[in-house]
Amino acid sequence: MALTEFGKAVRKARIDTDCTLLTMSKELGVTSAFLSGLETGSKKIPKKWVKDIQDFFKSRGLELYDLQQLADVSNEYVSLDGLSQSQQMLVAGFAKSPLTPEQLKRIAELMKNINSNGD
């Protein structure tokens, strides 16, 4: 089965930290089949596991910043819990927008700049 973007990020992180799937699964207390399922998308990715995986790699000196977003895409689900009405409307608007991929890319870059600058 092909890897999801989440799976690609996790696999790259394992390679970058010289960690095998088996080593990671043992340290996290799960089977390698479970982790493989998260990488391939055959299993939904619980928020708890995103945090656990981020912490796992952080302890090895590697920060994974977009992992929750990649998990949301892999799960085909974005929670609106805790978002304001205007944020929820914005998410819904983007989900059904007629914007081109180039326009969406430009908006994503703008949002990234806003978030990184704290403006």
Where are these regions (language model features)?
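A short, Lys/Arg-rich alpha-helix, primarily the initiator
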Residues: 1-16, 102-106
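DNA major-groove recognition helix of helix-turn-helix/homeodomain DNA-binding modules
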Residues: 48-66
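C-terminal regulatory/oligomerization modules of transcriptional regulators
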Residues: 85, 92-119
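Recognition helix of helix-turn-helix/homeodomain-like DNA-binding domains
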Residues: 29-45, 52
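Residues within the helices of the helix-turn-helix
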Residues: 11, 22, 51
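Short alpha-helical DNA-recognition segment
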Residues: 18-36, 67-69
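The alpha-helix within a helix-turn-helix
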Residues: 14, 25, 54
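Short, charged recognition helix plus adjacent turn
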Residues: 64-99
